[in-house]
Amino acid sequence: MTDLTTLTIAQARDALITKKLKATELTEAYLKAIELANPTLNAYVTITAEQARKMAAESDRRLAKGERGLLEGIPLGIKDLFATHGVHTQACSNILDGFKPNYESTITANLWQDGAVMLGKLNMDEFAMGSSNETSYYGPVISPWRKKDSNEKLVPGGSSGGSAAAVAAQICAGATATDTGGSIRQPAAFTGTVGIKPTYGRCSRWGVVAFASSLDQAGPIARDVRDCAILLRSMASFDEKDSTSVNLPVPDYESYLGKSIKGMKIGIPKEYYLAGMSQEIIDLWQKGINWLKEAGAEIRDISLPHTKYALPSYYIIAPAEASSNLARYDGVRFGLRVPGKDIIEMYENTRSVGFGDEVKRRILIGTYVLSSGYYDAGYLRAQKVRTLVKRDFDQCFDSGVDAILTPATPTPAFGIADEKIKNDAVAMYLNDIFTVPVNMAGLPGISVPAGLSSNGLPLGLQLIGKPFAEEVIFQIAHIIEQEAGIFCAKKWWI
């Protein structure tokens, strides 16, 4: 019998519609897979088995009556950043210890409305701050991928490492994730999965724990481009509760897959050729260029001159917004409370014990750049640079370019015990060098697997699109996927 967890969302959907499969059977298969994998991979921080069974049974009842939502009976994992009513929501931080919200995020509400089943909450970097999923209060996530002939434990990327690892390990059909500077696309590239950061404003941020509010955007991680397109259609919506939500129709992204890209203009930015970049990343990029050229696209060399300033300005803007957003966590009404002799000491004790080192580092940086005497020199200048980064992209798209192709990451996944990266914050931050400019400009970006490194690890390519043109980058990503194929990790943990 086919292992039901190997089915894509599209395949499972079709099997459920034709009654070859029941939602309860599919859910039980995933719960069993989680039971086998999670003690090793640590992808889930909460498993909602009984809730999943109940939701699946309700899906079966609807399917029996010929009623079905877009994701009817499809079991999903939810990043621990999304508020889920009555279920553990802690942003993988000790400071939110025991917090169970009495409300539902707009995105998860959309998914449940469409019939999806919740398997549980997924591990992540604390408050989404990290690129390796090592800053979580619940410990690191282990990637399902390994180097050839090696037992070294690898990172799945971050901050959505639990989402990417769970999808790659086939312990959920798809997952929600968030991306502030690359937290969907980098883990997707590291794990051979597909991840899209939609245009800022496409998906509601209501009920999603904030990191940097002007940069945060939610999106899906899935096994292939089609599954990603199906998930985004359900997740995206206009929401009056989010002042940055944009009231535009949500296309049927899946319907664009398989359409010709003949005549499309694809930009190749010279600034993304970094000094010291590995030859296999350059070769992968060239391979992607050739695939698109063979599919009829026109390749154009372009310049994004302010790209090199995007990362340093991001690491001023994001911590500044984080220090403001995280000021609300004080131990008074919910989460962790560490007693003190007075209220000030209680605040200090709670925040000192509740926040991890990386979160404290970013709060300190953010508070510093917003402080009197440094605001103009730091934060204000960084915002001006952000405007220039966005202007570069605008000029490029105004010149007729339909999408931009770049590598997704400068390297494949690295080891959990890699002290060089672990002890060097800048080296860790450089993981986001190709992804951060997209967040700074508020554009859609997708990471699609395009090959394997010499060590047998996944490598991804990134496509960047015009605002609210996610269907175009899905269309192009599908071409790359057809040429590159699908990459699956061996289940060494069973």
Swiss-Prot record:
It comes from the Bacteria. It is an enzyme of class 6 (ligase). One of its GO terms (cellular component) is glutamyl-tRNA(Gln) amidotransferase complex. Transmembrane segments: none annotated. It catalyses: L-glutamyl-tRNA(Gln) + L-glutamine + ATP + H2O = L-glutaminyl-tRNA(Gln) + L-glutamate + ADP + phosphate + H(+). Keywords: ATP-binding, Ligase, Nucleotide-binding, Protein biosynthesis. This is Glutamyl-tRNA(Gln) amidotransferase subunit A. The lineage of its organism: Bacteria, Pseudomonadati, Pseudomonadota, Alphaproteobacteria, Hyphomicrobiales.
